C-alpha cells in the first residue's frame, strides 16, 4: 500500500514555499544491483519500491503533480532481456497499484509514445488511466518511451494539422500555442527536477516543461531514495531565489 505504511512521525513541510510540480529522473537501478552482485532486474524491482515511497511522500506533502522518468525513448538500445523484464514489471506495477492509487484520489497518466509497447501493456495503461481519470488529488505522470525532443516534435505535428484544417494560422503560432500541444499542458510547469545516481544531466527529459525549473542532483542511487533524501531536495529548493530569467536586482 502507498499510504498505509507511511511514517506518521514525518512532519509536513510549509506548503507556502513547496514546489507544486516535481519531476524525478530515477537513475541508478543497474548500478545498485551490480554493487550487490544481483541482476539488473533486481535493481529495477527495488526502484519500483522507491517509486512507491516517492508517491506516498508526494501525497503526504500535497504536491499538485509528480512526474517520474521510467523509460526513455533511448532505453530501447538495452538488451532484449532487460527490456522484456522492464515491460513485465511495468504491467505488474500498474496491476498491483492501480486500485490503491484510485483509493487515494491519485490521477495516473502515462506520457510518451505508448504505441511501441505490447498490446497487453497498452491495454493495461488504458484501463489504469480510465479508472483514475476523474480523480483530483495528486497528478502522477509516468514518462515511458518518452523523450523531450519527441514531445516537442509531436506538439509541432499537431499544430501543423490544425493549420491544415484552418483552425490555426501560421502567424498565430507562439510559445503559448505550442505549450498547449506538449505533454502535461494542463498542469503547471515543473518547479523542481531531482536526479538520482550522481549524474548531472537532463537526459532529454521534459525539455519544454523544465525551462525554469530548479535542479537537484544527488549521488544516492534510485533504489535507496527515501523521504530523507526527498526532504533534502525540498529544503534545497526552498532556499533558491527563483527569478525566472529576471535580474536579481529588480
Swiss-Prot record:
InterPro entries on file: UPP_synth-like (IPR001441), UPP_synth-like_CS (IPR018520), UPP_synth-like_sf (IPR036424)
Binding site residues for substrate: 28-32, 40, 44, 72-74, 76, 78, 195, 201-203
Reactions catalysed: 8 isopentenyl diphosphate + (2E,6E)-farnesyl diphosphate = di-trans,octa-cis-undecaprenyl diphosphate + 8 diphosphate
A Pfam family recorded for this sequence: Prenyltransf
UniProt GO molecular function: ditrans,polycis-undecaprenyl-diphosphate synthase [(2E,6E)-farnesyl-diphosphate specific] activity; magnesium ion binding
Gene3D superfamilies listed in its UniProt record: Decaprenyl diphosphate synthase-like (3.40.1180.10)
Gene Ontology BP annotations: cell wall organization; peptidoglycan biosynthetic process; polyprenol biosynthetic process; regulation of cell shape
Highest taxon above the source species: Bacteria
Cross-referenced NCBIfam families: uppS (TIGR00055)
This protein's name: Ditrans,polycis-undecaprenyl-diphosphate synthase ((2E,6E)-farnesyl-diphosphate specific)
Species whose genome carries this gene: Blochmanniella floridana
